[in-house]
Amino acid sequence: MLWANVAKAIIIISTIGYIINISTTGIPVLKESYSLITQHQEYPELHFRLLNNETELELYGGIEVGSEKQLEAQLDAHPNIKLLHLHSIGGRMLGAIRLAGIVKQRKLDTYVKERCASACTVVYLAGVNRLIGENGELAFHAAGIGGTSTHNNEALSSSLKTQYINAGVPKWFLEKVLATPNEDLWIPDHNDLRKAKIITQVVNS
């Protein structure tokens, strides 16, 4: 009788754990997947502008899955581009990861004159040299998936965490980023950005 009750207790605990896991990870992921499948656009349209005799390219707007194809087309059409200006509120993490891959592959420098926030920072960190204007801001927070902040969920935040670790972001800085709820923004000053080696140079804008 004792072992039967223990078995029942284990089943109940496992069921509760499954329900909690589904509600904290499964549902947000399902929502995000549905949004991708239906191609629901949540962010401002992405635009590009050529600068400095076609040696620089400005990316502004929201980042979506597929933005990487737009960037690649611009770089193929204008092979002298060496510097990518970023002015974005962020967007989908998968789109940002793919954009970062292209920036690395093409060995581009990155530059922020005004603000690069959220997923945009993943793209910025892919630059060989990472420049920022004297009034430029990099704004960080934990990722959001399916309308849910991942700041208190290690499983959901793993993708963003991996990107930052691969970019060489130090632990103290990363912990601050991942502890910032998705609805908030942490904007470190240039001294902190230098200390963390996020930026390589502050330039006149």
Task: Report the location of each language-model feature.
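Hydrophobic membrane-insertion alpha-helices, especially the h-region
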Residues: 4-24
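STAS-typified acidic loop motif
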Residues: 30-70
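Acidic/histidine-rich, surface-exposed loop or edge segments in extracytoplasmic proteins
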Residues: 51-59, 79-83, 140-144
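Terminal peptide-recognition signature
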Residues: 59, 84, 124, 193
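Extracytoplasmic/secreted envelope proteins and their assembly/folding machinery
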Residues: 68-75, 96-100, 104, 121, ...
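Short, glycine-/small-residue-enriched flexible loop/hinge segments at domain edges that mediate gating
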Residues: 80-95, 109-115
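Glycine-rich beta-to-alpha active-site loop
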Residues: 104, 108-145
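Charged, glycine-interspersed solvent-exposed loop segments at helix/strand-loop junctions
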Residues: 142, 146-205
